[in-house]
A protein has these predicted regions:
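Patatin-like phospholipase
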Residues: 1-158
Length: 158
């Protein structure tokens, strides 16, 4: 269970009916993770205690405020969100895609303001569902973290 983890763990999901973010600190770890990554339209919502939950990224793509709520005094955020694509936003689907992208960017910017350090891997050619590029994404993350290592060590006083 979540509460039995050696390191404090919080899992963010979005309660589908209210649209509010929920921080799971107790309960079944697997079910909470399943809820947290239930991308709408791709996976069915997870049901916990009679409520439906979907991807926590809808309310907190980088959940800095939830880490602070849990008592974190130093937050290192990893931002993998991309900028809205400069595309033809004509037609219903194009407008919808661009609108969602703009909303996500706004939520993300708000959350990132609360981080002490932001690591930003260069993932410009990769989409959120580009699973074939996962090794390249990992390497980009390592490079971005390495670029921030001096600041990380300074903040950690090591």
């Amino acid at each position: 269970s979540i509460e039995q983890m050696r390191i404090p763990l919080g899992i963010v999901a979005t309660e589908l009916q209210s649209g509010k973010g929920v921080l799971f600190r107790t309960g079944n770890t697997g079910l909470a993770v399943r809820a947290s990554c239930s991308v709408p339209g791709v996976f069915q919502p997870a049901v916990i205690s009679g409520k439906e939950y979907v991807d926590g990224g809808l309310v907190a793509p980088v959940p800095v405020s939830y880490a602070r709520q849990m008592g974190a005094t130093l937050v290192i955020a990893v931002n993998i969100s991309s900028e809205p694509v400069h595309q033809d936003a004509s037609g219903t689907f194009g407008i919808l895609q661009q609108t969602i992208s703009i909303m996500q960017r706004s939520i993300n910017e708000y959350e990132l303001k609360g981080a002490d350090i932001v690591i930003q891997p260069q993932l410009k050619q990769m989409g959120g569902s580009d699973f074939k590029s996962r090794n390249a994404a990992i390497l980009a993350g390592e490079a971005a973290a390495q670029a921030q290592m001096a600041l990380i060590k300074e903040k950690l006083k090591i």
